[in-house]
Amino acid sequence: MVQSQSLSTLTICGSVKVSSLLRNRLNSVKASSLIGDRCVSCQFLRKSPSFRSHWKSLKQRNLLRVEARWPFQGGGEQGLDPSSERSESANEDILIFFFQLDLATRVQYAMNLEQYDIAQQLREKLTEVEEESIRLQEGKRGSSAKSEAQDKGISIIRLRADLQNAIDSEDYGLAAKLRDEISKLEAESLAVSAKALAFEKAEYAFRLGQKLRHKTFGYRAVVCGMDPICSESSSWMEAAEVEKLPRGSNQPFYQVLVDVRTHPDLLVAYVAEDNLLAPEKPDKERFDHPYISFLYYGADTAGDFIPVKQLREKYNRPRHEVPFDSQDED
């Protein structure tokens, strides 16, 4: 199956561009020749012939049924197709997460071999990647907006003090300018605070590991990440026609893995909550994707996938417990 492939095959599927951050980390670790050819840096981007062969057969098999996949295929009057929601940034985010997991494993491996110098070098690389990952996640979660709101609040306090001094000295021209600046900053602060609050109070209809179906394109998908609002660029949102959605960009967006048997050329999609639908009955059908075994422990009794602990911690999501049903024992 696809998910049995090694980590070294992950970046060859489709036209995946690895971020400059990840590429720099890989090259840096590789230059150190850490732990020989067992280190991820020496094989992370190495292509697997057996995987390419399997991937080619998957694509050929699906070419025969691409037109009959879903009655709403093609996006209706919009003329969109699934590739409009392709997200290289989401895929890169996942690859960085893989790199974190692998570096942590290599640190432990070096410690077990009592190669402490190597372990220290790996730990330093891991710390760099973790710090960058945290910074990116905080930006998505609104931490930067909250900080910006606080900065504007401090500026307003200072301007009010200047305003009072201008009034006391009867410099009414300066006072008028300061009053206008304060009004402008207050409006900006209110908007930024509202954005930060939206991030903090975000509610998600779907959870990590849940199997879903795209409302328009019909493909099956599994949630592997989530943002309170759309974090993609304005050009991406324009191409995906996000503004035509009922809630636009101000709604949760999900990183989803797409079943390669349905769309072998679309690994990761970035989809609005409005465009996703949970199945009425448990989906226990086979789901193929090269990232599955790295992001999930396996499937639960309802057919959804169980995210690894590190993935839950990344998005600060609780562990999902499948409700007990006595009929399952029959």
Curated annotation (Swiss-Prot):
Outline where the chain's transit peptide begins and ends: 1-65
Every copy of the UVR domain together lies at: 153-188
Query: Any idea which GO molecular function terms this record carries?
Result: DNA binding
Subcellular localization(s) per the UniProt record:
Plastid, Chloroplast
Q: Name one Pfam family in it.
A: YccV-like
Q: Does the keyword ATP-binding apply?
A: no
What did gene disruption experiments reveal? Reduction by 10 precent of total chlorophyll, with slight increase of chlorophyll a/b ratio and slight decrease of chlorophyll-to-carotenoid ratios. Overaccumulation of ClpS1 protein.
Annotated TM spans = none
Q: Which GO terms describe its cellular component?
A: chloroplast; chloroplastic endopeptidase Clp complex
Which keywords does this chain's UniProt record carry? Chloroplast, Coiled coil, Plastid, Transit peptide
Coiled coil start-end: 112-139, 175-195
Q: What is its main location?
A: plastid
UniProt region (YccV-like), positions on chain: 203-310
InterPro entries in the record, alphabetically?
Answer: Clp_protease_adapter_ClpF, Hemimethylated_DNA-bd_dom, Hemimethylated_DNA-bd_sf, UVR_dom
Q: Where does the source fall among the domains of life? A: Eukaryota
Q: Where is this region: NTD, required for CLPS1-binding?
A: 66-138
Tissues expressing this chain: Expressed constitutively in photosynthetic tissues such as leaves, stems and flowers, and, at low levels, in siliques.
Summarize the protein's role: Clp protease adapter that facilitates CLPS1 recruitment to ClpC chaperones thus forming a binary adapter for selective substrate recognition and delivery to plastid Clp protease system (CLPC).
Q: How does it assemble?
A: Binds to CLPC1 and CLPC2. Interacts with ClpS1; this interaction stimulates their association with ClpC. Associates with the Clp substrate HEMA1 (GluTR).
Protein name (record): Clp protease adapter protein ClpF, chloroplastic
Q: What is the source species? A: Arabidopsis thaliana
Write the gene name. Answer: CLPF
